[in-house]
């Protein structure tokens, strides 16, 4: 069930065509984000996202508007995938690893907001479940211990 998402403003980039052809030869679905829905790359794709943007304000700046549009579309796609795959609770990203101090603080804030608990309770929940944010949120919301919360999440 793999899918390739290609990006090409013009739809004329040869190495993008090559990657698309390779993915297609492996049986993958191929989608494309491009400004030119009639390009060769668009003809190779199973799905084409081609926003109609109009001309850039100042010509010659390497399709700045198209690049920004592609970035916005990618953010929408990844946000949708995060929600669909269970990485989001309410509007909070709960599948967050604490790889540094900033992310550890973000985990605490998420558990506090999702669970309506104090900082001390959030830290204690995170410490008891090896800093698995989603597990800590479930613990605070339900009163389950770390093991039971982890098992319940694994089942769903």
Where are these regions (language model features)?
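Short, amphipathic alpha-helical interaction segments embedded in low-complexity terminal/linker regions
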Residues: 81-156
């Amino acid at each position: 069930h793999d899918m390739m998402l290609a990006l090409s403003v013009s739809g004329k980039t040869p190495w993008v065509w090559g990657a698309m052809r390779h993915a297609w030869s492996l049986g993958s679905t191929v989608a494309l984000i491009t400004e030119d829905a009639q390009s060769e790359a668009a003809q190779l794709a199973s799905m084409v996202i081609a926003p109609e943007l109009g001309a850039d304000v100042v010509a010659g700046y390497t399709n700045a508007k198209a690049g920004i549009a592609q970035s916005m579309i990618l953010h929408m796609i990844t946000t949708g995938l995060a929600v669909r795959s269970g990485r989001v609770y309410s509007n909070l990203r709960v599948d967050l690893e604490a790889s540094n101090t900033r992310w550890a603080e973000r985990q605490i804030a998420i558990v506090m907001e999702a669970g309506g608990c104090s900082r001390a309770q959030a830290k204690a929940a995170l410490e008891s479940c090896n800093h698995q944010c989603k597990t800590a949120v479930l613990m605070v919301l339900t009163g389950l211990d770390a093991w039971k919360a982890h098992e319940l999440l694994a089942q769903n």
